[in-house]
């Protein structure tokens, strides 16, 4: 797509993504703790299509933020959901989706590009179109967490907020499904993430 030039990320795209990541880090007070910013998922591999999201990962050692890794993970996830909910950022027609990843956890993906170092950490291969398990789980977990968030709002009797969030989420799930079908394969990241959500 329009993101790559001679196997490296387009400079304008890179600058914009770095600005987004830095703004998120500043607003969530994790500035100075971000070890790397990576671009991953289908747009960083050969599984992309017109409805693919831009998966922007901020790598942080959760132990640097607090002792309880699970609580920090939940907090980072909540901050990420709130950010994605209130910022509808598009680049070249693709929505930017932020993730905060524990830098001590291994992340397996078909393609991972470091924005900080401007180089491939995992270079995708056109011949090896394998299932990107981490991308599938990340996508499904992201939606599942948002479903939980809607439930929480409803239980707290924030009905208007829950309704607004549910409508937005419904559109997101529809997009996920149609994106998977458009990608043409039953093995697309979006289609498998949709099935994972549906069956859980």
Enumerate the language-model features and the residues they cover.
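Catalytic core of pol beta-like nucleotidyltransferases
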Residues: 1-52, 60-200
């Amino acid at each position: 797509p329009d993101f790559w030039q001679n196997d490296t990320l387009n400079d304008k795209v890179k600058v914009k993504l770095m600005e987004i990541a830095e703004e998120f880090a500043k607003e969530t007070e994790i500035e100075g703790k971000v070890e790397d910013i990576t671009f991953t998922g289908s747009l960083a591999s050969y599984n992309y299509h017109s409805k693919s999201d831009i998966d922007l990962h901020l790598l942080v050692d959760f132990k640097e933020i607090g002792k309880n890794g699970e609580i920090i993970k939940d907090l980072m996830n909540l901050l990420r959901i709130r950010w994605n909910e209130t910022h509808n950022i598009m680049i070249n027609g693709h929505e930017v989706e932020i993730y905060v990843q524990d830098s001590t956890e291994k992340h397996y993906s078909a393609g991972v590009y470091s924005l900080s170092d401007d180089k491939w950490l995992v270079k995708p291969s056109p011949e090896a179109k394998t299932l990107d398990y981490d991308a599938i789980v990340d996508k499904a977990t992201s939606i599942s967490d948002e479903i939980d968030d809607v439930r929480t709002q409803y239980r707290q009797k924030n009905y208007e907020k829950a309704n607004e969030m549910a409508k937005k989420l419904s559109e997101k799930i529809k997009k996920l499904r149609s994106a998977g079908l458009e990608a043409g394969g039953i093995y697309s990241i979006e289609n498998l993430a949709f099935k994972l959500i549906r069956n859980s």
